[in-house]
Amino acid sequence: NELNYRIRANGGKIFLSNQIKLAYYCRDTLTGLMKQARLNGKWTILTSKFVPGSMGLRHFVPLLFLLSLIVLPLLSILHPFFGYLLLIELILYAGLDLYASFQGNATKPKDIFIKFWIYPLYHLSYGIGSIQGLWSLRTIQDE
């Protein structure tokens, strides 16, 4: 994201071709995937600080999601509206999660079940990483 942003900002173009071949090595454990998500979240915050405009709004959605899961239950103590808002958010998320879990080549119930749980774990890990990134910014600015 940041490299593409700098290339375009300096008048360059991004070349896309379906003839390019590559090998992608995904994380082979859930712990590894969650660590990757956490680090992605952290570096999204740091990159956006040092290269403003390089990250899109979608990169901050997991942080907002995590914060809503923390703040809305607390606010619901003050007014039931926030509890309903949280309920609507969770129903929408679960519905989108279920829909996404059935997409792609996952046809076995076990695979769909795993995907259903991986999406929220990834998003929450990414959000935690974003909070770590915000904390890192605070420490960097103190130096």
What are the functions of these language-model segments?
Residues 1-55:
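Catalytic donor/gating beta->alpha subdomain of glycosyltransferases that bind UDP-sugars
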Residues 64-140:
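Membrane-embedded multi-pass helical conduit in multi-pass membrane proteins
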Residues 24, 59, 123:
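Histidine-centered active-site/metal-ligand motif
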Residues 35-38, 61, 89-92:
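Alpha-helix N-cap/helix-start motif at coil-to-helix transitions, marked by capping-box chemistry
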Residues 51, 58, 138-139:
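Short amphipathic alpha-helical leader/targeting segments
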Residues 55-63:
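Select subsegments of transmembrane alpha-helices in polytopic membrane proteins
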